[in-house]
Structure formats: structure tokens, C-alpha cells
Regions:
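ATP-binding glycine-rich phosphate-binding loop
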Residues: 51-72
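ATP-binding pocket architecture of kinase catalytic cores
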Residues: 76-98, 104-186
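Active-site activation/catalytic loop segments of kinase-like enzymes and analogous catalytic loops
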Residues: 283-326
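Short, Lys/Arg-enriched N-terminal segments with co-localized hydrophobic residues
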Residues: 3, 20-33
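Juxta-kinase regulatory segment immediately upstream of eukaryotic protein kinase catalytic domains
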Residues: 33-54
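Catalytic activation segment of kinase domains across protein kinase-like and atypical kinase folds
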Residues: 257-296
Length: 333
């Protein structure tokens, strides 16, 4: 049996007190209490062997709703309860099946390498009470999963050469451990990193011209530059069809905040956010990291003069990546 005792603890009591005593505030209080009760009932659907003392919001992710599930026992881990956004990932079963294959394979590789601290180096998802092979539950049209919380770990938002090198090593090691995965993973977001598809989308956007900007000189200049690069941008897809370039298990969302660092920042502990793990070309992961990390501005920066390519981050990430990935890459790759 699962012993679950719910205590309304910070930050929710402070939030409740701050809402005031008006009818509208009272309704909000009731909704918060109902949310806590609902979250507790969802946790109970997983094979948790600890006493839950608190559930509170965690992180600032844009895709999934995430909560920290705090347990009372010192010898038991805390957990992370997460609602999967099935509008972004409509095939939840495929997402979790991919994750199960990947995390199981990584765990086996780490054990073979002599790693004993598995908890901090690979995500662990809990099965449901009703089905030991199922890693998510559906409640009122929403899909939830529960994983072990990795403590003594931090995420980073900013990138410097040191963290870029560590990220390169980590993502390269991630791919290396999965280079021999025997199972074919599903494509959780169709054509997510398919450059041929993306270029066709761009052409269609030009035809529709919804914003009425197609004839602007700056837009025409950008389209001309993209046209010059289109053949190189789609080379991977062509080589793949010719059988010259393999698709591998890739993360497909290689940002620096999709990995956990040790508290002192000296080591990458674990690659996280595995919803987009799927077959792709290795350039997807390599280039996707540099797309954000090596830029001096945000990806939606309208002032082009602020956008520069950071050679120091590029070189550090490349050295780190090749140090881990060189062992399995083909000469063409």
C-alpha cells in the first residue's frame, strides 16, 4: 500500500493568504486546494513507496506543467510530476515508449561502464500501480508521468566556453551510448528537423504572405540568402535517401538548459527533457545547440546588428562533442 499524507505547505499557504477575503479570492483559494487534491490523487496512481508531504510547482518550462513531489522519508527520493502536453506530442504512448527504450539503454551502458550513481546520470520514470509496463496515466483527458527528482543538480541558462565544452561532451556521450539501440524509435513530432519540409513550409508562407511583408527589401534579401543555401541545408536528407548517411537516436532539442549540471557547475550529470528523442541525423543535435548557444542574441531578435556568431562557444562545443562522439561517427559524418 502507498502511504500518502498531504500537508498544505509553502509556497501554497503564502499564496492562499495573499489572495485576500473577497468572493473572487475565495474562489481562487478553493481552486488551489482542489488542484492540490487532484495532484495528490494523480501521484497515488504511480508505484510510489514513500509518504508525500508536499507538492509544489517546479521550474519554468513552456511545454509541460511540472511539480515537485516532496516525500517525508530521508531514505526515499523526491519526485517530479509532469503533465505531458499532448497538443505538442499527440502520441503520448510513442513519447513514453521512446523514453523507456532510451533510458533503459543508457542505464545498461552506464552499468557496463562501472557507474554506480545511476540516480544522478539517467532519468528514472515510475510505473503505474495498475500496469508495471506503463509509465503514464490519463486523467480527465490529460496525461501525467512521474520521475525521480535528481537532487544536488542545477540547470544553466547562459553559455560560456567551459559549459559549451561540457555540453558538447555530454550530448556526444548521449549519442554514443545510444548508437547501438536495437529498436527503431518513433517520430514524436513529424518532420521536426526535416529541412526539406521546413523549406517547403517557408515557400508556402511566402505564397500566403499573411503579414504582407513578402515584398519588403529585408525579407527579399533573407529569402535570397536562404535560397543560396537551400541545397546545402537539405544535403543530409538527400544523402539519407541514398543510404550514405544513417539516422541515429538524437535528442533533437539540445539546449544548455536541457541538461543538469552538478551544483558547482563542473560536471554535466544528466541529459533531460527526452520528449523529442527520435531518429534524426547527428547534425540535428550538433547544429541545434549552436543555433541558440553560439548566438549573441535571442532567436527572435529583430535587430540584426546584435546577432553575432560566438566562435569561442562553437570551438569549445565542437571539441567536447567530438571527444565523445568520434568513436561512432562515420567519415562522412
Amino acid at each position: 500500500t502507498i502511504a500518502l499524507r498531504f500537508l498544505l505547505m509553502p509556497p501554497f499557504p503564502r499564496l492562499l493568504d495573499s489572495l485576500g477575503s473577497s468572493d473572487k479570492s475565495y474562489e481562487r483559494k478553493i481552486k488551489i486546494i482542489m488542484l492540490q487534491s487532484q495532484l495528490q490523487s494523480i501521484v497515488e496512481k504511480f508505484a510510489v513507496s514513500a509518504t508525500v508531504s508536499n507538492i509544489r510547482p517546479l521550474g519554468s518550462g513552456l511545454i509541460n506543467d511540472t511539480y515537485l513531489v516532496v516525500t517525508e522519508e530521508k531514505d526515499q527520493p523526491d519526485y517530479v510530476l509532469q503533465r505531458i502536453n499532448h497538443e505538442v506530442f499527440p502520441d503520448v504512448d510513442m513519447v513514453m515508449r521512446n523514453i523507456a527504450i532510451v533510458t533503459r539503454h543508457i542505464r545498461e551502458r552506464l552499468i557496463a561502464q562501472g557507474e554506480t550513481d545511476l540516480r544522478h546520470h539517467v532519468l528514472e520514470f515510475l510505473p503505474t500501480v495498475e500496469d508495471a509496463n506503463r509509465l503514464y496515466v490519463e486523467v480527465d483527458g490529460h496525461y501525467w508521468r512521474l520521475m525521480v527528482f535528481i537532487d544536488h543538480a542545477v540547470t544553466k541558462q547562459e553559455v560560456n566556453p567551459e559549459s559549451a565544452h561540457a555540453a558538447g561532451q555530454s550530448f556526444g556521450h548521449f549519442q554514443a551510448m545510444l548508437a547501438d539501440v536495437p529498436c527503431q524509435l518513433g517520430e514524436t513530432i513529424k518532420d521536426f528537423h526535416n529541412m526539406e519540409f521546413r523549406i517547403e513550409q517557408l515557400k508556402q508562407a511566402c505564397v500566403e504572405d499573411r503579414a504582407g511583408r513578402f515584398d519588403e527589401p529585408v525579407v527579399q534579401e533573407l529569402l535570397e540568402q536562404l535560397g543560396k543555401r537551400a541545397e546545402a541545408m537539405t544535403e543530409a536528407e538527400r544523402l539519407g535517401r541514398e543510404g550514405k548517411l544513417p539516422k541515429r537516436v538524437c535528442h533533437c532539442d539540445t539546449k544548455v538548459n536541457n541538461m543538469l549540471f552538478s551544483e558547482d557547475g563542473s560536471e554535466v550529470l544528466c541529459v533531460i527533457d527526452l520528449d523529442t528523442v527520435m531518429p534524426s541525423f547527428i547534425f540535428s543535435d550538433y547544429g541545434d545547440f549552436l543555433r541558440t548557444a553560439a548566438s549573441t542574441a535571442a532567436e527572435d531578435e529583430p535587430d540584426f546588428s546584435k546577432i553575432q556568431f560566438r566562435q569561442d562557444v562553437f570551438q569549445a562545443f565542437t571539441k567536447g562533442y567530438l571527444a565523445s562522439a568520434r568513436s561512432f561517427l562515420t567519415p562522412l559524418e
